[in-house]
Amino acid sequence: MKELDHRDLIEEAEPLAPGLIHEIRHPLMGILAGLELLARRIPAVSSTQEWQLLNEQAARIDELLRTYQDLFAGGPVERLPFPVDQTVRRAVSLLSPRIRKLGARFSLEAGPAPAVAVGAAPLLVHAITNLLANALDAVEERGTPGGRVQVRVLRPPGRVQVRVSDEGTGIAEAIRPHLFQPRFTTKPPGKGTGLGLHLARTAIERSGGELHLVDAEDPARASWARTEFAISLPSSGGAQR
């Protein structure tokens, strides 16, 4: 039998992804239905933090799987005005168990006024959670006490930006040109597929935006950041549908 390395396995499995996603959603629908039935039979349970967490995370898995289905299908994406601040907070909340461990070393800066962009909110959630999970991984991997992670919402003219910065391991110059290539990963086998950044950029581009690694010379970059990514979307004021 042909021996496959980790990258070969990912490449061979990729065409099966839409079918696998479909199969995973079947038992997930059963979990969501069971949670709803439990809340109906025992109304008090739906007010507990444990039930709310289970329901929210199961719904998030379903949303994530549907997002992946849409990405693999390659069909048109409806672009509508949506509140970026609210969407960013949703993405952050999905990683709250990991973020809580950072305490004051994590910060979210959304600005004084609501920012409204044009695009697909679920795709932005997908991209932010990917970037934020990578940032948390980098800080944990570095292991230096005091490593920070920050999410900011900026408003350059005609755009809305979401920036994810971290004080983790950093990214070597030699690998930066390959970051968004499919199946490229710096993580050990079993820790990463090499599809995360590729799919995050694909999601943002299909939403009408851009995703890039921020240069050290960028004046808006966090001065302490070892790595910073920026998502840019048209603002609702000057965007074209």
Regions found by a protein language model. Name each.
Residues M1-L20, L32:
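Conserved HAMP-HisKA connector
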Residues T48-R98:
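Conserved DHp (HisKA) dimerization/phosphotransfer helix of two-component histidine kinases, i.e.
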Residues R100, R105-A115:
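Conserved catalytic submotifs in the C-terminal HATPase_c
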Residues G146-G158:
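Short beta-strand/loop element within the Bergerat-fold HATPase_c
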Residues D166:
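Acidic ATP/Mg2+-coordinating residue in the GHKL
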Residues I171-R183:
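Short conserved segment of the HATPase_c
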Residues I204-E205:
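Detector for a conserved hydrophobic position within an alpha-helical segment of the HATPase_c
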